[in-house]
Design a protein with these regions (language model features):
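Outer-membrane beta-barrel architecture
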Residues: 56-60, 102-104, 147-149, 193-195, ...
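Surface-exposed loop and membrane-interface regions of Gram-negative outer-membrane beta-barrel proteins
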Residues: 80-99, 107-158, 175-178, 255-257, ...
């Protein structure tokens, strides 16, 4: 199975380093655009700003407390697939283009009130692979985000913000909760969020309903798919920290390896990152899940660990090794031991072909990243996939079953290699080209 990817991304944003020499700084690009703070442009003479910066901070009052920031994000991606789904049942080869446009307005009305709005148009050309144009591919003219913030000052260094409306979530390294920037249509939720910011802690507490894509109309929240929780980040030092989280998911009519019913699942997790030395970084994350699916109780867990080594004498070159494990069921029906990956950005951790997700999986991987010029970066990654438990299924990046569990089959899934080249055309435009190949062990093939 082979996948060729090429994409061009354009964003109205400015790299921080380009403006620091002028005596002011602008924020680095964040896919969650509402996290960008452009208030640093307050008081800067507009004649000193770059043309694209002038729409990022427009004063609406003489004192500068009322202002608006406009921005956007355009992406076009070409995909070429060969032997998709290993040549069965049909339409194994195809090429198509995906398009996505995002435009936002960030209104600041005084120091406490804020309104953030973002519209989206996601479309796809003729996709003849199984599933055709899927909900993750197509969502035409939709309100992606529309929320109101009200911020209280607790003291000179701490604030408490209440957010109500349609919003994107992205916590930690996006292993469990992500707006899914790789997918064309993205994710979003309707809900309420509280955000506590102190010099040492950032705490999000939230209650929401997921918004599935309605390809025939506007998206509406699904009261049968709810997400709530608390996500706290503690700063330990400049290069280290700890995250603690509790995530509550409630869904109707789900099935895990033969156990069906309504799901009520709690995820308790912790993530820690830091440095061993000037050249060696590390990260670990673990989570345990409890609850019930129908009449079956839930007991599942995940763990990931990664070390990153900065290669001496090489320009921004890094070599990394990682282990990802997520539990599976040891027998069908009854107690559920399959980890639920929730709303992940699995594409970033289990290969770009998206055959594998964070459920019933062991992935041993290595990656090498290097900068070959000021504008060009190359990354190569190798994944070795195994099912954690032979009696459970192989699940893809979306949580769908690729192959049902079979205790008599080998746990060996196969190997994937991903090669990516990215080129920065300008501060606002980046292009990338990727090639991914996967070799699947014969017993794992779904057909």
């Amino acid at each position: 199975m082979v996948c060729l990817l090429a994409q061009v991304i354009s964003s109205v944003t400015i790299a921080q380093s380009d403006t620091a020499a002028k005596g002011y700084q602008t924020p680095k690009f964040n896919f969650l655009r509402f996290k960008e703070d452009w208030s640093s442009l307050k008081g800067v003479d507009r004649k000193d700003l770059q043309p694209s910066e002038r729409i990022k901070y427009i004063e609406l009052s003489k004192n500068g407390n009322n202002w608006v920031s406009f921005g956007g994000h355009l992406r076009s991606r070409f995909e070429n697939h060969r032997n998709f789904a290993f040549g069965a049942p049909a339409d194994a080869d195809d090429s198509f283009i995906l398009y996505r446009a995002l435009f936002h307005a960030d209104w600041h009305l005084g120091e406490q009130l804020r309104i953030f709005s973002e519209i989206k148009h996601a479309d796809i050309g003729s996709r003849d692979l199984p599933g055709r144009a899927r909900p993750i591919d197509e969502d035409e003219l939709e309100v992606q985000q529309l929320f109101i913030d009200y911020t209280f000052d607790i003291d000179a260094d701490s604030t408490l913000t209440f957010r109500v409306g349609r919003q994107e979530y992205g916590f930690g390294k996006s292993r469990l909760i992500s707006a899914l920037p790789w997918a064309n249509a993205l994710r979003h939720w309707d809900g309420i969020t509280g955000i506590l910011n102190t010099p040492q802690f950032n705490v999000n507490f939230f209650y929401s309903s997921f918004n599935p894509v309605d390809q025939d109309g506007f998206n509406n929240s699904d009261s049968d798919n709810q997400l709530a929780g608390i996500y706290a980040t503690q700063k330990l030092a400049a290069n280290s920290g700890i995250e603690y989280y509790w995530l509550r998911t409630e869904r109707e009519d789900v099935t895990f390896n033969g156990t069906s019913g309504d799901e009520n699942r709690d995820t308790f997790g912790i993530r820690h990152w830091g440095i061993f030395s000037n050249r060696l970084d590390y990260e670990v994350e673990g989570a345990y899940q409890t609850g019930d699916v129908g009449t079956g109780s839930v007991s599942a867990f995940m763990f990931t660990g990664e070390v990153i080594y900065a290669v001496p004498g090489a320009s921004n070159s890094k070599l990394s090794f990682a282990v990802d494990y997520a539990s599976g069921d040891d027998e069908a029906a009854g107690e559920v031991n399959t980890f639920n990956q929730l709303f992940p950005l699995g594409h970033a951790y289990f290969g770009f072909i998206d055959l594998v997700g964070r459920q019933n999986i062991l992935d041993i991987s290595a990656a090498y990243r290097t900068r070959i010029s000021d504008r060009t970066n190359v990354r190569v990654a190798i994944h070795n996939f195994f099912r954690a438990d032979d009696a459970d299924a192989l699940y893809n990046a979306g949580g769908g079953v690729v192959r049902a569990g079979d205790a008599s089959a080998s746990s060996d899934i196969g190997r994937e290699i991903d090669l990516t080249l990215s080129y920065k055309l300008s501060n606002q435009v980046t292009g990338s080209l990727g090639l991914s190949l996967i070799h699947i062990s014969e017993p794992t093939r779904p057909y």
